[in-house]
Curated annotation (Swiss-Prot):
Activates KDO (a required 8-carbon sugar) for incorporation into bacterial lipopolysaccharide in Gram-negative bacteria. This is 3-deoxy-manno-octulosonate cytidylyltransferase. NCBIfam families: kdsB (TIGR00466), PRK05450.1-3 (NF003950), PRK05450.1-5 (NF003952), PRK13368.1 (NF009905). Belongs to the KdsB family. It catalyses: 3-deoxy-alpha-D-manno-oct-2-ulosonate + CTP = CMP-3-deoxy-beta-D-manno-octulosonate + diphosphate. Signal peptide: none annotated. The lineage of its organism: Bacteria, Pseudomonadati, Pseudomonadota, Gammaproteobacteria, Cellvibrionales. GO terms for biological process: CMP-keto-3-deoxy-D-manno-octulosonic acid biosynthetic process; lipopolysaccharide biosynthetic process. It is found in: Cytoplasm. InterPro entries: Cytidylyl_trans, KdsB, Nucleotide-diphossugar_trans. Keywords: Cytoplasm, Lipopolysaccharide biosynthesis, Nucleotidyltransferase, Transferase. Transmembrane segments: none annotated. One of its GO terms (cellular component) is cytosol. Its main location: cytoplasm.
């Protein structure tokens, strides 16, 4: 299995400025993500950034990094620039590991690449995991996914999907019964993707769709254009990424900093 990992890392963040360079156990967060990716079976790991400070930090720890445009409307557009700079072939597989996932397991990176490689009908692959807390079900920052019987994604949403009409009608929306009954089929989408390079070149030519603009979920553009995303349950726990100062504190606790 041959694949490359690209780690998009933007310095600007409304909720956590300078996020890639926030220190965890004395190292910038982006270095932890890079090291996780290096432990996978990837033939190459490269950071894609639009900020000189991130570029310098990555070169400082000996990592591979590319400078990209600051004008990209989405992370997928940034990936397309990277594969163009690297002159990768249409059939090659790229795994997009988010730059705010310092605890991403290497085996999960391998899994999503293998998932795409073994599903020729899919143009992309991603992962999910069961939701076990009702607060996650109703949290719009926790993206949910529903799939068909072949595990191709039907839809991604910030809303609680699927909605069990009968259980909610019986127990209401604040009952502990909801987790064991109404949400046994509810899956949290894990934001790691494997793409065939050809899809990335197509993606940047498509306009954003109505549902993508409503949900603010760019993966919906792939489904809207008739292509398939294959989804598997992750083979290992994937701790949430770092979006807020509270998330950063949680990760620092996991590293023993606090």
């Amino acid at each position: 299995m041959s694949f490359s990992v690209v780690i998009p890392a933007r310095y600007a963040s409304q909720r956590l400025p300078g996020k890639p360079l926030q220190l965890i156990s004395g190292k910038p967060m982006i270095e932890h993500v890079y090291n996780c990716a290096q432990r996978s079976a990837a033939s190459r790991v490269v950071v894609a950034t639009d900020d000189q400070r991130v570029f310098d930090a990555v070169t400082g720890f000996g990592g591979d990094v590319l400078m990209t445009s600051a004008e990209h409307p989405s992370g997928t557009d940034r990936l397309q620039e990277v594969v163009s700079q690297l002159k990768l072939g249409d059939d090659e597989i790229i795994v997009n590991v988010q730059g705010d996932e310092p605890l991403i397991p290497a085996e999960v990176i391998n899994q999503v690449a293998r998932n795409l490689q073994s599903n020729s009908a899919a143009s992309a692959a991603t992962l999910c995991e069961p939701i076990t807390a009702f607060e996650d079900v109703i949290n719009p920052n926790v993206v949910k996914v529903v799939c068909d019987d072949q595990n191709f994604a039907h839809y991604f949403s910030r809303a609680p999907i699927p909605w069990d009409r009968d259980v909610y009608a019986k127990f209401g929306t604040h009952s502990a019964n909801q987790i064991s009954t109404a949400h046994s089929a509810t899956r949290r989408h894990i934001g790691i993707y494997a793409y065939r390079v050809a899809l990335l070149h197509q993606f940047v030519l498509w306009p954003s769709g109505v549902l993508e603009n409503i949900e603010k979920l760019e993966q919906l553009r792939i489904i809207a254009n008739g292509l398939k995303i294959h989804v598997q349950d992750a083979c290992a726990e994937v701790p949430g990424g770092v979006d807020t100062p509270e998330d950063l504190s949680r990760v620092r606790v996991r590293f023993g900093d606090i």
